[in-house]
């Protein structure tokens, strides 16, 4: 994973050719680039936080472009960014690719660079982008055409925003805070900025929108076969996301999971355990860290230990530990006192920009603290010891509600309305969830992966699963009970993180609603 920041400034006559490298451990709080704008300098610390293993600043005077990149190294060989491809292309890549041509020992950034190097006649940058499979964001500058390409994968699993100023300057960044006037990139749109004409084209897409089938199987005759197929693609999705974890430091090898104890994340944990058990570990059990976040809530009077998600996570963790004794499953109880919530609230509000509703904050701040991973392990005798997450790859169950009708508001919809709603949900998830979540989670120097949002899982789930199997996640509950022995967990009701962790409605303001705009000022520090 990497952080991306690009600035094209046609009127910057002070830019010099340079490449400055910053080693691991560099502090960026007061970093300034003397020949760059205040917006660029303001964004640098956000980008650096996303990639703690390496950062660099590259500037090319002839093109009037500056690139700041950071790297969280998860694939070998260690690859610095940005990448100069034969002085023809300049590449920034943030994400993970799962194209079958990429072996476990290959680096996906170098894979893209190789594709650009070996483009056949009649093929171009857009053809390379359309061939990518995985979760990613990118910028590519083509020297010969003087065009800048940037965008996100079709589902939008990595954040990216851009801004074109009245003076035709272009900024592209993974995260911006409230610096400048940025808008989020639409998932799957290939943005093309021509530095000669100063025109931005956003008409190309890397993938057509998904369409949910309206097929109904009233007798449930296909339930067994569909469940089998869904289990297979989900397992494959988890497998390729587990086997592509190769961190730079061995202590970062554990896999972490954002864990509420519900069916979505429990299915992911069970599948990870199945994949891990395929290998012979000679140095002890493989480790999975279940990150459960809970808040002290003065409005309800609840402490973190009292929240619904904490209680459920303890029970679900025990179930998983009993099912998979050959895996060291640690439940990390992340407690957030109210004063800690208040301390970080302005920062998280700024980090999730341009999202600015009460609901966005309650979700974002839960993921911020969960991914930070500072919590406790509780022994069998009830003794708690402080624990800091080691894993830097986090798995999330996001996407299950959108694919399988998990939200309460879907329960009583007639089939044709449910088809329309689920189609809208999966095609808009880049804006509704993913941009915000990636910004706040990646700030902790980790990467999040979404097995339910794998291209093949979405294709099967939208095109081949009858719509009546998607009421209250019927099909997923079938997979959980039949293939993963999660019978007890599979019957648990849906509970949104902000309510399960009690990060919503912290104060006694009875008129506050989730869609209300935040009143607090953003603090960029």
Swiss-Prot record:
Active site (UniProt): 2 (for gatase activity)
The entry's keywords: Amino-acid biosynthesis, Asparagine biosynthesis, Cytoplasm, Glutamine amidotransferase
Major localisation: cytoplasm
GO molecular function: asparagine synthase (glutamine-hydrolyzing) activity
SUPFAM superfamilies for this protein: Adenine nucleotide alpha hydrolases-like, N-terminal nucleophile aminohydrolases (Ntn hydrolases)
Region (Disordered): 503-525
PROSITE patterns: GATASE_TYPE_2
A biological process from GO: asparagine biosynthetic process
Pfam families listed in its UniProt record: Asn_synthase, GATase_7
Residue span, Glutamine amidotransferase type-2 domain: 2-209
InterPro entries: Asn_synthase, Asn_synthetase_domain, GATase_2_dom, Ntn_hydrolases_N, Rossmann-like_a/b/a_fold
Keyword Manganese: no
Record-annotated Asparagine synthetase domain positions: 210-523
Subcellular locations according to the entry: Cytoplasm
Residues making up the signal peptide according to the UniProt record: none
Amino-acid biosynthesis in keyword set: yes
GO cellular component labels: cytoplasm
Domain of life: Eukaryota
Residue stretches of biased makeup (Basic and acidic residues): 506-525
Misc remark: Present with 3750 molecules/cell in log phase SD medium.
PANTHER family: ASPARAGINE SYNTHETASE DOMAIN-CONTAINING PROTEIN 1
Name of the protein in question: Asparagine synthetase domain-containing protein YML096W
Organism: Saccharomyces cerevisiae (strain ATCC 204508 / S288c)
């Amino acid at each position: 994973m990497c952080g991306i920041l690009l600035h094209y400034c046609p009127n910057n006559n002070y830019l010099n050719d340079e490449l400055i490298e910053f080693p691991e451990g560099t502090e960026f709080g007061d970093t300034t680039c003397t020949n760059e704008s205040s917006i660029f300098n303001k964004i640098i610390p956000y980008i650096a936080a996303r990639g703690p293993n390496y950062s660099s600043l590259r500037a090319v005077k002839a093109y009037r472009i500056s690139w700041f990149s950071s790297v969280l190294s998860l694939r070998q060989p260690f690859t610095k960014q940005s990448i100069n491809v034969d002085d023809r292309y300049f590449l920034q890549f943030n994400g993970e690719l799962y194209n079958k041509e990429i072996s476990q020992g290959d680096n996906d950034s170098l894979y893209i660079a190789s594709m650009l190097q070996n483009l056949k006649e009649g093929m171009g940058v857009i053809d390379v982008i359309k061939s990518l499979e995985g979760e990613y964001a990118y910028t590519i500058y083509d020297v010969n055409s003087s065009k800048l390409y940037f965008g996100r994968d079709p589902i939008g699993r990595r954040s990216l925003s851009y801004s074109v100023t009245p003076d035709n300057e272009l900024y592209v960044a993974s995260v911006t805070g409230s610096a400048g006037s940025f808008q989020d990139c639409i998932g799957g749109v290939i943005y093309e900025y021509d530095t000669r004409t100063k025109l931005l084209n956003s008409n190309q897409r890397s993938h057509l929108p998904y369409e949910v089938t309206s097929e109904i199987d009233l007798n449930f005759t296909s339930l067994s076969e569909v469940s089998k197929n869904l289990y297979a693609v989900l397992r494959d999705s988890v497998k390729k996301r587990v086997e592509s974890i190769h961190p730079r430091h061995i202590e970062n090898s554990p896999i972490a999971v954002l864990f509420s104890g519900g069916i979505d994340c429990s299915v992911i944990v069970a599948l990870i355990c199945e994949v891990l058990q395929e290998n012979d570990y000679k140095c002890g059990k493989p480790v999975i860290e279940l990150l459960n976040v809970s808040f002290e809530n003065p409005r309800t009077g609840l402490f973190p230990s009292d929240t619904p998600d904490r209680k459920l996570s303890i029970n679900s963790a025990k179930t998983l530990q009993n099912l998979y004794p050959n895996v060291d499953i640690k439940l990390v109880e992340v407690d957030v006192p109210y004063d800690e919530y208040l301390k970080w609230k302005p920062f998280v509000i700024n980090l999730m920009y341009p999202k600015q509703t009460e609901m966005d904050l309650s979700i974002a701040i839960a993921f911020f603290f969960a991914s930070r991973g500072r919590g406790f392990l509780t022994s069998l005798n009830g003794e708690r010891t402080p624990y800091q997450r080691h894993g830097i790859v986090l798995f999330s169950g996001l996407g299950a509600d959108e694919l399988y009708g998990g939200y309460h508001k879907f329960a009583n919809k007639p089939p044709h309305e449910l088809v329309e709603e689920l189609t809208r949900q999966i095609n808009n998830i880049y804006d509704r969830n993913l941009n915000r979540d990636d910004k706040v989670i990646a700030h902790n120097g980790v990467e999040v992966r979404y097995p339910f949002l794998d291209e093949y899982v979405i294709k099967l789930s939208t095109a081949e699963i009858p719509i009546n199997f998607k009421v209250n996640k019927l099909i997923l509950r079938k997979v959980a009970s039949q293939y993963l022995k999660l019978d007890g967990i599979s019957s648990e009701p849906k509970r949104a993180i902000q309510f399960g962790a009690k990060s919503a409605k912290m104060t006694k303001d009875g008129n506050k609603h989730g869609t209300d705009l935040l009143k607090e000022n953003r603090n960029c520090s």
